[in-house]
Amino acid sequence: MFIVSQDTNFAMKGFLGFLMRYADEIPVSKDKDYMERHFYRTLNNLLVNKKEYILIYPEQEMWFNYRKPRPPKRGAYFYAAKFNVPIISCFVEMRDMDKDDTEEFKRVKYVLHILDPIYPDPEKSERDNSFDMMKKDYEQKKEAYEQIYKRPLDYAFSDSDIAGWKGTTE
């Protein structure tokens, strides 16, 4: 499995930096020429020719210990539609533990839920597929959130939205 990561992460020092540079990481960049040529060719080779898995965290979906699914951006779905490959939808459940991790946080247990895969529809355009896949992925994550936490998803902030947080907003 390959992982897409921001190109600036490759400058990290130590063991994590070593992993970033040598553990099947694919850099993503703001450089338009790189993205249109090298990145595109790399994904095409890995997804279409070699049938590899590629992990792409959709933009702005990763917030530290934030339980709620974030409304997605189109990037990962664009490439899935472009290369006619499925999205393996996932939701990470976060359970607060009793032990402290830091002064501000309790330890958190992470449970990965693999949801139904989402396939492009061969009758639709790449554009329509990317938007439909994005919508379906969000719907699945919303449903998982509501089933796991036993409450409807809304975006009014409460302390419990941040897993393990011992603080208060008051």
Spell out what each predicted region is.
Residues M1-D33:
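Catalytic core of membrane glycerolipid acyltransferases/transacylases, capturing the structured
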Residues R37-E170:
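Non-catalytic C-terminal accessory region of glycerolipid acyltransferases
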